[in-house]
Amino acid sequence: MAIYRFVVRFNRSDNPRALGLLKDAHALGFAELKLIQCQDLYFIEGDLSPEECMRLALNLLTDPVTQSAEWDELPGGRIDLVADVSMVEVALRPGVTDPVADEIVRAAHELGMAGIVRASSGFRYIIQGAVVETAVELARRLLANMVIQRWTIGEIEPSFPG
């Protein structure tokens, strides 16, 4: 069965979540960071048509006024970043309850998308001004809660609740 990765971005880089994380990173001593982009990740397993992916993105996963979404079927294409930009993805550890994912499945079924089997959620952080070592330290100290979340540099593999 197919697994889709939906990436939801804010249309503006000055959204409160990104600005708050950048401020926190600077307070922790990561003064070299220029920008942190916060994006929501949703992994959806099921049989979806392109039209259903569009409906899911527009009607359920985004606020179309402030956000936009893109999606692909896993494995997706490779993401190329420039030299001073790193990407960290964070997701819940296997076995941790994901109420956002539960609601996605429930709401998608209400919208008539019965082909959705399960979902999981996470976050993507694009960090400008960070070499990989800095991104690793930032993930450990700020971006992930190690008790309930796992993280990786680059794209994370989805895990779904049992």
List PLM regions with ranges.
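Core nucleic-acid recognition elements
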Residues: 1-162
